[in-house]
């Protein structure tokens, strides 16, 4: 392979880069995300027909990497714009690190000045009728074994606190602090920032008591005591949705449902921003866009 030596050089820098991420207390989720992007880029370099190095790497090579990612997608679908933007961000940060540790005058970060516009979409939450099905399932689930207790706790945290999947992955029983009618939950959020979640104590008191009495450290844990990773949480949620007869996937749909329910109850947008852990209120504003049914209803109401 013509680029093998370059690929090995990138790998060497990546080992140092990962050490820096760990030393600066970046979350496991962040490190995994970088690992996925950079390893994919290294594999692309190994297969790339053009001979490249730090000295002659160009913007067109990065665009070809994005095209390569399109081709290797298991799903027959276009690579999401948000994914492209994330890959560029990861590579720019990594190559900036290389620049700081490489004896060269070349500004590698300039290669990644690629403007990728991510279309604004109104997030879809769980339909009201399906929320009722999910809540009925949670109300009737028998808390008589570990798997049922874990299922109840994970679903309630995602549905009623607005937690992200990555936040759930690192959440520990000791992070739950009782304060009046609430549990205040301290965790690490997106961008490795400290984040506070809230959930009514009455919703999960039995589950938390079980975890404490059985010395279970992590909320998302397997029966054998191992911490669940993102793919295991994803499969657990999808299996649960299928079991109760609703067609959704993953954890983020429940976060969207939480956000939309707050907006529907006229909770102040600044408060919603804090509850979701958004860095910018502009991100939160996407939940204020009315859906098509709301627009139609409002229009018909004006004709009455």
Q: Could you say what each language-model-derived stretch is?
A:
Residues 91, 154-155, 162, 166-171, ...:
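Alpha-helix N-cap/helix-start motif at helix boundaries, enriched for small hydrophobics
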Residues 161, 165-166, 170-204:
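Conserved tyrosine-mediated DNA breakage-rejoining catalytic core shared by Y-recombinases
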Residues 125, 188-191, 276, 282-301:
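Catalytic-site neighborhood detector that most strongly recognizes the C-terminal catalytic loop/helix
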Residues 149, 247-266:
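Short basic/aromatic active-site micro-motif
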Residues 156, 160, 257-279, 286:
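C-terminal catalytic core of tyrosine-transesterase DNA break-rejoin enzymes
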Residues 200-246:
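Active-site/catalytic core of tyrosine-dependent DNA strand-transfer enzymes
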Residues 120-146, 163:
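Long, amphipathic, Lys/Arg-enriched alpha-helical "connector/arm" segment
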Residues 2, 12-29, 35-122, 141:
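N-terminal core-binding DNA-recognition domain of tyrosine recombinases/integrases
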């Amino acid at each position: 392979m013509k680029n093998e030596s370059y690929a090995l050089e990138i790998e060497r820098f990546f080992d140092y880069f990962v050490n820096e991420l760990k030393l600066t207390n970046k979350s496991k989720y962040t490190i995994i995300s970088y690992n996925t992007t950079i390893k994919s880029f290294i594999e692309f370099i190994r297969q790339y027909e053009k001979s490249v190095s730090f000295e002659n790497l160009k913007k067109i090579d990065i665009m070809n990497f994005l095209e390569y990612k399109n081709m290797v997608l298991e799903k027959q679908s276009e690579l999401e714009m948000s994914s492209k933007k994330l890959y560029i961000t990861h590579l720019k940060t990594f190559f900036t690190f290389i620049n700081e540790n490489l004896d060269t005058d070349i500004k590698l970060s300039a290669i990644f000045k690629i403007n990728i516009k991510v279309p604004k979409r109104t997030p879809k939450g769980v339909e009201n009728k399906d929320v009722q099905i999910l809540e009925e399932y949670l109300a009737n689930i028998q808390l008589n074994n570990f798997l049922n207790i874990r299922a109840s706790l994970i679903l309630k945290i995602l549905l009623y606190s607005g937690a992200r999947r990555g936040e759930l992955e690192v959440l520990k029983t000791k992070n739950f602090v009782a304060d009046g009618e609430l549990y205040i939950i301290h965790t690490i959020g997106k961008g490795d920032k400290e984040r506070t979640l809230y959930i009514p104590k009455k919703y999960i008191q039995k589950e938390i008591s079980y975890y404490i009495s059985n010395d279970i450290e992590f909320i998302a844990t397997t029966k054998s005591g191992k911490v669940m990773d993102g793919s295991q949480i994803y499969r657990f949620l999808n299996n649960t949705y299928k079991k109760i007869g609703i067609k959704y996937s993953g954890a983020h749909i429940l976060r969207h449902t939480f956000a939309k329910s707050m907006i529907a109850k006229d909770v102040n947008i600044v408060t919603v921003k804090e509850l979701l852990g958004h860095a910018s209120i502009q991100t939160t504003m996407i939940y204020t866009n009315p859906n098509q049914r709301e627009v139609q209803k409002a229009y018909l109401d004006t004709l009455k």
